[in-house]
Curated annotation (Swiss-Prot):
This is Pre-mRNA-processing ATP-dependent RNA helicase prp5. SUPFAM superfamilies: P-loop containing nucleoside triphosphate hydrolases. Residues 141-156 have a biased composition (Low complexity). InterPro entries: DEAD/DEAH_box_helicase_dom, Helicase_ATP-bd, Helicase_C-like, P-loop_NTPase, PRP5/DDX46/KHDC4_KH, RNA-helicase_DEAD-box_CS, RNA_helicase_DEAD_Q_motif. A motif (DEAD box) lies at residues 640-643. GO terms for molecular function: ATP binding; ATP hydrolysis activity; nucleic acid binding; RNA helicase activity. Residues 514-692 form the Helicase ATP-binding domain. It catalyses: ATP + H2O = ADP + phosphate + H(+). It comes from Sclerotinia sclerotiorum (strain ATCC 18683 / 1980 / Ss-1) (White mold).
Length: 1114
C-alpha cells in the first residue's frame, strides 16, 4: 500500500500547480462520472482491461481518505491523491516537452516498423497468419510478469525503467485491441494454457504499474463522449468478486473473434461482428489522449490510422459483398423478359463496388473468396444458383409469376365433350391372350360308368328316362342316367354331406346332369322350378376343384358361377357352405349394392369359388388394373338362369367375362325356361354340349294348382284379402308371395295391407341390398308371412312353407309366369298360384294360356277369348307380339344418359362470353317455337324428339297467343256480336263434345278479370319432375314478378292410359293470361324452358337408375 502511495506522489510532481488546484473540483466531477459510469453498460474489451487497472488501484488506495479521482473509463483511468505530499523538484516546461516529443517519436518509429512488418507478412503469409501473430504477441506481452514496483522515488529512474516496457505494449493500437481477448483466444482458439483469472490479475498489475505515465493534463478530455460512447462504463461497482463475470465477458468476446477468423465454413457466416473502422479510430484517439498530445497534424493522424488498414479493407470487402447481394436481389425482383437469370452479372457488381482501387488488393481478393459463403444467410437462392450454373434455368419459371405462358384451352364443346366422355369411360377388363400362356392342363372327366348301367340296353334307358319325368337328351355320347348317389362318382366327403342334408336320392335333372358334367361335357340343363338344379352343378364343381393344385397368393378362383339377380347369388352361396366346410374350400359372393372393399378383401385372401352377378364381376376384374383378381385359373363356369343371362340385357357383360376365361373351360348352363330364340346365343359359348330337358321347356310343375281370374283393377285388392283370409284360416304358418309389376305399386300395396292388419314387407330393385337381404331372411324365417315383390324375386327364391303365390299384376311373358308360379310347390310339395288379369292386358293372355295348356290344366273361357282376340289383332297388324326377350341391353342406358347430359350442357351455358350469349339467343328462338296449343287426342303428330315428351305435345312448335273472347252483350249492336256469339258457341260445342282443349282456348277464360291475351300449355302427360318444375310456387313467383302475367293451373290429372270422359274436366294444363301479347309470350317461354329442363332431368334420372323408383335420390 505504501509503495502505491509513493508512486502516486511521484506522479503528482509532474503536474503543474493549476492541475493540483483543480483536484477538488475534478474529484466531485469524477464522482459524478463514476456514478454514471457504474450505471452505464457497455462491453468494449479494451476499456475493460483498463478498468481492471482502475479497480486494482482503487482497492489499494481505498483506505486513504484523501484518495484521488475515480479512474476514467475512457482513457485508461488516472488515479491520484488530493493532498500535497513531499515530492522532488518540479521539472521545467522545456524538459517535459522534450520528454513528450521523445516518447512520441519513439512511438511513431515503432508504429512505422510494425506497419512495414505487417505488410511484409501479409504479402508472405496472408491475413490469417498476421492475425495469429498479433494475437500471440499480445498474449505474450500480457502474460509476462510485471516489473516490481520501484522503491526509489526517483522520477528519472521510473521514467527510464518503465518507458520502454510501457510504450512497447501499451500504446500499440492493435495490441490494445487484442489484449482484451488474449486470455480467451489463447485458451480456445490458439491453444494456450494460461488460466483466465491469472491472466487478468497479471494485466491489472502491469497496468497499475504504469499509471503515472498515462496521465493526461487536460481535464476537459474526460468530457469527450463522442468517440468513446461505445466503450463499457460499468466499472465502479466491480471488485475482486467481479472478476469471474469479467472472464465470462472475455470468453464471449473471444467467441466472436474466433468465429470471425476460424477456417470452419459454418463459423464464417457470423463475420458480421468484425471490428469496424470507427472503433479503430476510437482506439487511436484514446492513445493520443493518454499521451497528452494536442493538435496532431494530418500526417500524424494518417500514421495512427495505418494500424487499422487490414480491418478497414476487410470491412470494405464485406460491405461490397453485401451491396452486391442487394443488387442481385433487386435484379431478381424485377420482371425478366425471358425468365432466364444470367449468373455472369455477379462479377459486374464486384467491379462496380471496387472502382476506387485500380488494382485488386490481395487482401480484398482473399476476402472476396470468403464472401460467397457469407452471403448464404442473406439469400439461399443465390447460393443454389452459384452451384447450378451449368443446369438449365427453366425450373425457375415454374416458381415465379414472370413471363408465364398461360394458354387457355380451346372452348370447343365437341372437344370438351370428348374429353369428358373419355374421363368417364369405364375401365375395360385387361385382355389375356391365352395362346401365349403356358397354362397347366387340368382334368375334366371324373366319371366311370357303374356296372349296373353297363349292361342296360338302349330301350331300357329310354324307358328309364321316360319314367324320370320324361327326360329328353340331345347330343353325342350322352351318359346314362344314374339312380342313386353312389353311382355319380363323387368323393366320400360330398356323400357324407349329402347324407347329413337328408337327400335320399337324386332328382330327375340330377340323375342325368351329374353324370354328364362329371364326364367333362358342356351341358345345357332345363328343368322345372324346384327340381334341384343347383345341387346338380355344385357337386361336380367340388370334385373338379379338389383335383387341381391349391391356390397361390396371386391366383384367382377355379369355379365361377354367375346369376342374373343378387338374391339368387346369395342363395347359391348359402347352399355351398355345408360342402365348403367339409372340403376345406372357400367361396366369395360378389354382387352389386354391397360394399366392394369387403368382397375385394375376401378375394385377396383366396377363394376357389366365386358366386357373382356379371356387373360386379366386371368391376372386380377392372379394379386396380386387374390386380384384384383374375380368371386365368377358371376352368369351371356355371350360368344359372341362362336364358336371362344370354338376353340382350346381360349378354354383352357375360361375353366380356367369357372372353377372359381360358378357351378349354367346362361350361354349364341351367334354367327352368329356355326359349328357342336363346339356343343360338347359348350354344355359341359351348363345345359339343349335351342338352337335357326334364318335363319340357317353360313348364309349370304339376304340383302347382294354377288359378287365373279376369278382374277389374279395383276388384283385385278385395279378392286378395279373400285369398289371404282363406289361407291363414287353414294354415297360420303358411307364407304368401305377391308379385307386382312396378316398384311404386309394391309400396302402395304394402301400405294397404298394413292398414288391414296383415304384417308384410316389400322387396324390389329400388331398395338397398341390405334391406333386400334382411327382408328375404325375415320372410324365410317366418317373421313376416307376406312378402310383396317385383320380378327380382321370381327366379331362384326357395322358401319353405310358401303355399300361395299371387300375381297381382299379370306377368308380361311366359317364362316370367313359369318362374313366378314356380316359387311354390318346390321339392315335391304342393302350392297354389293365382293370377289376376284385366281386360286391358289381353296381350299377356297368350303366355298364361299356353302355360296352363303345357301343364295340363284347363284354360278359363274368358282367358281363351282374350287370347283369340289378341291373336286376331296380331294377324291384322294392329298389335305386335313380344316374347319377353331380346331387350336393348345396358348400352341403351349409357347412350340415353350421355344424350341427356349433352342436352343439359347445351341448355345450361355459363354467361360471360359473346359466343355463348349468341348461342343462348338461338336457344331462346328455338323455345319461342315451342307449342302452347293442346292438340286433340286423335290428332296425328310427329314422334317427340325429347325423351319423356308425351304424344300430342310439340315443344318445337310456335307459341300461339290468343286474344280473349268476351261474352255477348244484350244491349249491343247485332251485327258484330253475332260473330262473337257464334264463335263462343262453337268453342263450347267442341269442348262439350270431346272434353279436350282446342286452339289454346280454356273453358273458363270468360270472367271480368280475364286478361286481354292468353295461352295454354298441357302438362298432364309430362313426367312428374317436369310438372313440378312448372307448378311449384318458387318458379311461378319468379315468372309472375318478371312478366306481370297471371298463371293458373287448371284441369285434372289423368294417369297414363286413362282418357277424359265426356263432360269431365280436361287434362291438367297451365293458363297464362296477360295484358299484352309480349308478356304472355315471355311467360310461356319461361314455362316451356322449365318444362323442358324437368323432362330432361326425369330422363337422366331414369337413365342413371333404370330399375329404381321412389327410393332413388336424384
Amino acid at each position: 500500500m505504501a509503495d502505491a502511495i509513493e508512486i502516486e506522489e511521484m506522479m503528482l510532481e509532474d503536474r503543474d500547480i493549476a492541475v493540483v488546484l483543480e483536484v477538488p473540483t475534478r474529484r466531485r466531477r469524477s464522482r459524478e462520472r463514476d456514478y454514471r459510469d457504474r450505471r452505464d453498460d457497455s462491453y468494449d474489451d479494451r476499456a475493460r482491461r483498463r478498468r481492471e487497472d482502475s479497480t486494482d488501484s482503487w482497492s489499494r488506495s481505498r483506505g486513504d481518505e484523501n484518495r484521488g479521482q475515480t479512474p476514467r473509463s475512457d482513457s485508461g483511468a488516472k488515479v491520484h491523491d488530493a493532498p500535497k505530499a513531499s515530492a522532488p523538484a518540479a521539472q521545467t516546461e522545456e524538459q517535459k516537452k522534450a520528454e513528450r516529443l521523445a516518447k512520441l517519436e519513439a512511438w511513431k518509429k515503432k508504429m512505422a516498423e510494425d506497419k512495414e512488418r505487417k505488410e511484409k507478412e501479409l504479402a508472405a503469409g496472408g491475413t490469417r497468419k498476421l492475425l495469429d501473430d498479433i494475437d500471440q504477441k499480445a498474449n505474450g506481452s500480457s502474460s509476462q510478469p510485471s516489473p516490481n514496483t520501484p522503491t526509489t522515488p526517483s522520477t528519472s529512474a521510473i521514467s527510464g525503467d518503465l518507458a520502454p516496457t510501457n510504450y512497447a505494449g501499451k500504446f500499440d493500437p492493435k495490441a490494445i485491441a487484442k489484449k482484451a481477448v488474449a486470455s480467451s483466444s489463447s485458451a480456445h482458439a490458439l491453444g494456450r494454457d494460461l488460466p483466465l483469472k491469472e491472466l487478468s490479475k497479471t494485466s491489472a498489475t502491469l497496468t497499475s504499474t504504469v499509471k503515472g505515465l498515462q496521465a493526461d493534463k487536460k481535464p476537459t478530455a474526460f468530457n469527450s463522449t463522442s468517440k468513446v460512447s461505445a466503450l463499457p462504463k460499468t466499472r465502479g461497482n466491480l471488485s475482486v468478486f467481479g472478476l469471474g463475470a469479467k472472464v465470462t465477458d472475455n470468453e464471449k468476446t473471444y467467441q466472436k473473434r474466433a468465429l470471425d477468423f476460424d477456417e470452419d465454413e459454418g463459423s464464417r457466416k457470423k463475420l458480421e461482428k468484425l471490428p469496424t473502422l470507427p472503433m479503430a479510430n476510437s482506439k487511436e484517439d484514446d492513445a493520443a489522449l493518454a499521451n497528452g498530445i494536442e493538435g496532431q497534424d494530418d500526417d500524424d493522424d494518417a500514421e495512427l490510422e495505418a494500424a487499422g488498414t487490414e480491418e478497414e479493407a476487410a470491412a470494405a470487402a464485406r460491405a461490397a459483398a453485401e451491396k452486391r447481394e442487394e443488387r442481385l436481389q433487386e435484379a431478381e425482383s424485377q420482371p425478366h423478359t425471358n425468365g432466364d437469370v444470367h449468373m455472369e452479372d455477379a462479377p459486374q457488381a464486384d467491379s462496380t463496388a471496387m472502382d476506387e482501387d485500380e488494382e485488386i488488393d490481395p487482401l480484398d481478393a482473399f476476402m472476396e473468396e470468403m464472401g460467397d459463403p457469407f452471403s448464404l444467410p442473406k439469400s439461399n437462392t443465390t447460393f443454389v444458383k452459384n452451384n447450378t450454373k451449368s443446369q438449365p434455368q427453366e425450373p425457375e419459371a415454374l416458381f415465379g409469376d414472370d413471363d408465364v405462358d398461360l394458354k387457355a384451352l380451346d372452348a370447343d364443346p365437341d372437344e370438351i365433350l370428348a374429353i369428358a366422355n373419355k374421363a368417364r369411360k369405364k375401365k375395360d377388363i385387361p385382355t389375356i391372350n391365352y395362346a401365349n400362356l403356358n397354362l397347366p392342363p387340368f382334368r375334366k372327366n371324373f366319371y366311370t360308368e357303374p356296372a349296373e348301367l353297363v349292361d342296360m340296353t338302349e330301350a331300357e334307358i329310354n324307358d328309364l328316362r321316360l319314367e324320370l319325368d320324361g327326360i329328353k337328351v340331345a347330343g353325342k355320347d350322352v351318359p346314362k342316367p344314374v339312380q342313386k348317389w353312389s353311382q355319380c362318382g363323387l368323393d366320400v366327403k360330398s356323400l357324407d354331406v349329402i347324407k347329413k342334408l337328408g337327400y335320399d336320392k337324386p332328382t330327375s335333372i340330377q340323375m342325368q346332369a351329374i353324370p354328364a358334367i362329371m364326364s367333362g361335357r358342356d351341358v345345357i340343363g332345363v328343368a322345372k322350378t324346384g327340381s334341384g338344379k343347383t345341387i346338380a352343378f355344385l357337386l361336380p364343381m367340388f370334385r373338379h376343384i379338389r383335383d387341381q393344385r391349391p391356390l397361390k397368393n396371386s391366383d384367382g378362383p377355379i369355379g365361377l358361377i354367375m346369376t342374373p339377380t343378387r338374391e339368387l347369388a346369395t342363395q347359391i352361396h348359402k347352399e355351398c357352405k355345408p360342402f365348403l366346410k367339409a372340403m376345406g374350400l372357400r367361396a366369395v359372393c360378389a354382387y352389386g349394392g354391397a360394399i366392394i372393399k369387403d368382397q375385394i378383401a375376401d378375394l385377396k385372401r383366396g377363394a376357389e369359388i366365386i358366386v357373382c352377378t356379371p356387373g360386379r364381376m366386371i368391376e372386380l376384374l377392372a379394379a386396380n388394373s386387374g390386380r384384384v383378381t383374375n380368371l386365368q385359373r377358371v376352368t369351371y363356369v356355371v350360368l344359372d338362369e341362362a336364358d336371362r343371362m344370354f338376353d340382350m340385357g346381360f349378354e354383352p357383360q357375360v361375353m366380356k367375362v367369357f372372353n377372359n376365361i381360358r378357351p378349354n373351360r367346362q361350361t354349364i348352363l341351367f334354367s327352368a325356361t329356355m326359349p328357342r330364340i336363346m339356343d343360338a346365343l347359348a350354344k355359341k359359348t359351348l363345345q359339343s354340349p349335351v342338352e337335357i330337358v326334364v318335363g319340357g321347356r317353360s313348364v309349370v310343375a304339376p304340383e302347382i294348382t294354377q288359378i287365373v281370374e279376369v278382374r277389374e283393377e279395383k276388384e283385385k285388392f278385395h279378392r286378395l284379402l279373400e285369398l289371404l283370409g282363406e289361407l291363414y284360416n287353414a294354415d297360420e304358418d303358411a307364407r304368401t308371395l305377391i308379385f307386382v309389376d312396378r316398384q311404386e305399386k309394391a309400396d302402395d300395396l304394402l301400405k294397404d295391407l298394413m292398414r288391414k292388419g296383415y304384417p308384410c314387407m316389400s322387396i324390389h330393385g329400388g331398395k338397398d341390398q341390405v334391406d333386400r337381404d334382411s327382408t328375404i331372411d325375415d320372410f324365410k324365417a317366418g317373421v313376416v308371412p307376406i312378402m310383396i315383390a317385383t320380378s327380382v324375386a321370381a327366379r331362384g327364391l326357395d322358401v319353405k312353407q310358401l303355399k300361395l303365390v299371387v300375381n297381382f299384376d299379370a306377368p308380361n311373358h311366359l317364362e316370367d309366369y313359369v318362374h313366378r308360379a314356380g316359387r311354390t310347390g318346390r321339392a315335391g310339395n304342393t302350392g297354389t298360384a293365382v293370377t289376376f288379369i284385366t281386360e286391358e292386358q289381353e296381350q299377356y293372355s297368350v303366355g298364361i294360356a299356353k302355360a296352363l295348356e303345357q301343364s295340363g290344366q284347363e284354360v278359363p273361357e274368358r282367358l281363351n277369348e282374350m287370347r283369340k282376340s289378341y291373336k286376331d289383332k296380331v294377324k291384322s297388324g294392329a298389335k305386335k307380339e313380344s316374347s319377353g326377350f331380346g331387350g336393348k341391353g345396358l348400352e341403351r342406358f349409357d347412350a340415353e344418359r350421355e344424350a341427356t347430359k349433352a342436352r343439359e350442357r347445351k341448355i345450361h351455358k355459363l354467361n360471360g362470353d359473346d359466343d355463348e350469349e349468341e348461342k343462348e339467343e338461338k336457344d331462346d328462338d328455338v323455345l319461342l317455337k315451342a307449342a302452347s296449343v293442346v292438340q286433340p287426342a286423335s290428332a296425328s303428330t310427329a314422334p317427340p324428339k325429347l325423351l319423356g315428351v308425351p304424344k300430342g305435345i310439340d315443344l318445337d312448335g310456335d307459341i300461339k297467343v290468343h286474344r280473349t273472347e268476351t261474352a255477348a252483350s244484350s244491349s249491343g249492336s247485332k251485327n258484330p256480336l253475332d260473330k262473337v256469339t257464334s264463335a263462343i258457341d262453337a268453342i263450347n260445342a267442341r269442348l262439350n263434345k270431346t272434353g279436350q282443349l282446342r286452339s289454346g282456348v280454356p273453358i273458363d277464360n270468360k270472367g271480368p278479370d280475364a286478361g286481354a291475351f292468353h295461352a295454354t300449355l298441357e302438362i298432364n302427360d309430362f313426367p312428374q319432375k317436369a310438372r313440378w318444375a312448372v307448378t311449384n310456387r318458387t318458379n311461378v313467383a319468379k315468372i309472375l314478378e318478371a312478366t306481370g302475367t297471371s298463371i293458373t293451373t287448371k284441369g285434372s290429372f289423368y294417369p297414363a292410359g286413362k282418357e277424359v270422359q265426356a263432360g269431365g274436366d280436361p287434362k291438367l294444363y297451365i293458363l297464362v293470361e296477360g295484358d299484352t301479347e309480349v308478356v304472355v309470350t315471355n311467360a310461356m317461354r319461361e314455362l316451356m324452358r322449365l318444362l323442358k329442363e324437368g323432362t330432361m332431368a326425369a330422363a337422366d334420372a331414369e337413365g342413371r337408375a333404370p330399375a329404381s323408383g321412389r327410393y332413388t335420390v336424384t
